[in-house]
């Protein structure tokens, strides 16, 4: 019979720590707008929702590779959008996305 495992909260990174970690390790992020959204901003949830807005192509593939390394031990859920998609859906406003740069300064 499987039991419920307790979570060691001392090992969980804050949203600010996650933002700093991603900005420091994913150098290609300078080419994109990057945000966090979702329940982790409220201190609940079990993953970090990240929104990346920018061009597709080789730069995006490089960023995805950087995310694989940077997020190897993090529960990241990453959404990629072209700028026109973000504008048309008003995703940033509707989901109350917060820039990673702002979170990293907290």
PLM-predicted stretches and their roles:
Residues 1-46, 53-106:
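Catalytic core of pol beta-like nucleotidyltransferases
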């Amino acid at each position: 019979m499987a039991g419920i495992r307790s979570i060691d909260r001392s090992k969980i990174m804050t949203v600010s720590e996650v933002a700093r970690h991603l900005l420091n390790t994913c150098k290609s992020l300078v080419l994109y707008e990057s945000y966090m959204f979702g329940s982790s901003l409220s201190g609940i949830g079990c993953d970090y929702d990240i929104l990346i807005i920018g061009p597709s192509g080789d730069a995006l593939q490089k960023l995805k590779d950087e995310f694989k390394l940077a997020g190897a031990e993090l529960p990241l859920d990453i959404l990629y959008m072209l700028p026109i998609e973000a504008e048309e859906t008003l995703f940033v406003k509707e989901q109350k996305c917060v820039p990673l740069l702002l979170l990293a300064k907290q």
